[in-house]
From Swiss-Prot:
Broad class of the protein's primary localization: cytoplasm
EC top class, as a word: ligase
Record-annotated site: Important for tRNA non-discrimination: H33, G83
Annotated PROSITE patterns: AA_TRNA_LIGASE_II
Species, as recorded: Methylorubrum extorquens (strain CM4 / NCIMB 13688) (Methylobacterium extorquens)
E.C. code: 6.1.1.23
Binding residue positions for L-aspartate: E175, R221, H456, R503
Alphabetized UniProt keyword annotations: Aminoacyl-tRNA synthetase, ATP-binding, Cytoplasm, Ligase, Nucleotide-binding, Protein biosynthesis
Name under which the protein is recorded: Aspartate--tRNA(Asp/Asn) ligase
Gene: aspS
Length: 604
């Protein structure tokens, strides 16, 4: 017999009745029924009920056991008495009568009980993460994460991709967030950086003549935590392809994500064909560049309607005269809501920094659509009808309005759309709704610096005739601001899973792109000289994307916080409470690295 086990705690079945088995695991729960002890023994694979009474020679040893002690038991499998079965457990029809028990690892008083669903402060959970991970839900999340990563790898290989490993110690990159720096002992005063992403390496892999790259890549960014973003470290499915168009990337990536989500969605529907939504349409119709398509509400522009001379609502008139816009957010079925529903939405809008949300409630009177509400009296019936038509509103619906600069109106309307959809329970949450957002603007006007600047990714290829692009001058600012980039995002349920792009592989086009944004060739050479040199030595057209693994797992585990799907996460202050990181270095370590500390004064 094996030293520790013949079976796992999830493997015992009725077919094993009568056999002598050996199990090892943790005491999940112990129940004393007066001379009879029931020990629920748990391991990675499941749980088996074990029972012992005073007739057993191991009874005294069993009496000493406590929650989370690690024990080994030998015993006979028997059928549970009628009426005591547990249909929720695969082992629920049998139990093991204990003949022998050995304590393998006693446990002290637990700072975090494993049995039960009691919530504990995050600080406690992270400090004792190894205990937290014994809890069923979190344990299942981590196992599901591993299965999802396996599925991603398998699907990528089936798609003709080859897995590469890129360096972890590299040079500091000027784009994105702050770098994590690693001092060099051999080169005093110089530092490596942990990669924010393997962006340049994966492009160099294409320039090196490889064709289809992927990597489950660790990425390191010194940035603040959010619910959907871990501080410090995260993983992404990094992808790059040579000789491809934007559509080729979509055709390669879409089946991978759709397949993984269908495999792990737990019965939820998954979008079959991911719709393409332009950035302009996303901002207009959804108020955000990562639309949640589970919500059926679509925002409409009603600036022209409120600009009509017959409309007397001065608040919106003033906004329009100053160059602003008015957006309409439909609220399906809201006419039947009490006044408090509308008052709460206005209070919420004021908490967002807006003066409020004007609204019209539409009802049918005499066979015609009639608008009521605080601002309806300022708007003629004919224009109300136009507003209702644009917003897709019918009798029994309401329409809310957001006014301001285009950016502010879009932002408020987008948030209101989500809030209204949630309040009215309009969203179909039994699905994973995907889309591609495409045609991002290459440039935008920087009002603060009064100059043209990059809008999103400066290294994406402009969707513009090359010769015409190279000929652009200072007088072409209107044309420049209209240039779109071959850049795309993939969005699921309102969460951005990834950004990607067809790369700018032409040095002359890249130099011109940066020159338009006010960066001289010397700046480009200084910061990206290595990449430019490679591009000058025969670079293929290439493009890629990098969906976030942590966010994919978070969605599929239906967790609101990314720390629930990471094995050993940091807290929001980028601290590892369990291992005590970051930690002070010893004077000897600092001397070896030629580093002297110059710390800020502690605040009183």
């Amino acid at each position: 017999m094996h030293r520790y086990r013949t079976h796992t705690c999830g493997a015992i079945r009725p077919s094993d009745v009568g056999q002598t088995v050996r199990l090892s695991g943790w005491c999940h729960r112990i129940r004393d029924h007066g001379g009879v002890l029931f020990i629920d023994l748990r391991d990675h694979y499941g749980l088996t009920q074990c029972v012992i009474d005073s007739d057993s020679k191991a009874f005294k040893a069993a009496e000493t056991a406590r929650s989370e002690w690690v024990i080994r038991i030998d015993g006979r499998v028997r059928t549970r008495p009628a009426g005591t079965e547990n249909a929720e457990l695969p082992t629920g029809s049998v139990e093991v009568y204990i003949d022998d028990l050995e304590v393998l690892g006693p446990a002290g008083e637990l700072p975090l009980p494993v049995f039960g669903d009691q919530e504990y402060p995050e600080e406690t959970r992270l400090k004792y993460r190894f205990l937290d991970l014994r809890r069923e839900k979190l344990h299942a999340n981590i196992m599901k994460r591993g299965a999802i990563v396996d599925s991603l790898r398998r699907r990528m290989r089936e798609g003709g991709f080859f897995e590469f490993q890129t360096p972890i110690l590299t040079a500091s990159s000027p784009e994105g967030a702050r770098d994590y720096l690693v001092p060099s002992r051999v080169h005093p005063g110089k530092f490596y950086a942990l990669p924010q992403a393997p962006q340049q390496f994966k492009q160099l892999t294409m320039i090196a003549g490889f064709d289809r790259y992927f990597q489950i890549a660790p990425c390191f960014r010194d940035e603040d935590a959010r619910a959907d973003r871990s501080p410090g470290e995260f993983y992404q499915l990094d992808i790059e392809m040579s000789f491809v168009t934007q559509e080729d990337v979509f055709q390669a990536v879409e089946p991978v994500l759709r397949g993984v989500f269908e495999e792990f969605a737990g019965g939820k529907r998954v979008t079959k064909e991911f719709p393409r939504i332009t950035y302009a349409d996303a901002m207009l119709k959804y108020g955000v560049d990562k639309p949640d398509l589970r919500n059926p509400l679509i925002i409409a522009d009603v600036t022209d309607e409120f600009a009509d001379d017959a409309v007397e609502f001065k608040a919106f008139k003033g906004v329009i005269k100053s160059g602003g816009v008015v957006r309409a957010i439909p609220a399906t079925g809201a006419a039947g809501q009490p006044r408090s529903f509308f008052d709460k939405l206005n209070d919420w809008a004021r908490s967002e920094g807006a003066p409020g949300l004007g609204y019209i409630v539409f009802e049918e009177e005499g066979g015609a659509l009639t608008g009521k509400g605080p601002i309806a009296k300022f708007i003629p019936a004919a224009i109300q009808a136009r507003i209702a038509e644009k917003a897709g509103a019918k009798a029994g619906d309401a329409v809310f309005f957001a006014a301001g600069t285009e950016a502010k109106a879009a932002g408020l309307a987008g948030k209101a759309r989500i809030r209204i959809g949630d309040e009215l329970k309009l969203s179909d949450t039994d699905q994973f709704a995907f889309c591609w957002v495409v045609d991002f603007p290459m440039y935008e006007w920087n009002e603060e610096d009064k100059k043209i600047d990059f809008s999103h990714n400066p290294f994406s290829m402009p969707n513009f005739d090359r010769d015409e692009f190279l000929a652009l001058g200072e007088a072409d600012s209107e044309k420049i601001l209209g240039i779109k980039a071959f850049q795309y995002d993939i969005v699921c349920n309102g969460i951005e899973l990834s950004s990607g792009a067809i790369r700018n592989h032409r040095p002359d086009v890249m130099e011109k792109a940066f020159a338009i944004a006010g960066y001289g060739r010397d700046v480009l050479e200084e910061k990206f000289g290595g990449m430019l040199n490679a591009l000058r030595l025969g670079a293929p057209p290439h493009g890629g994307i990098a969906p976030g693994v942590d966010r994919i797992v978070m969605l599929l585990c239906e967790e609101p916080n990314i720390r629930e799907v990471v094995l050993f996460p940091m807290n929001q202050r980028a601290e590892d409470l369990m291992m005590g990181a970051p930690a002070e270095a010893t004077p000897k370590q600092l001397r070896e690295l030629h580093i002297r500390l110059n710390l800020p004064e502690k605040k009183a």
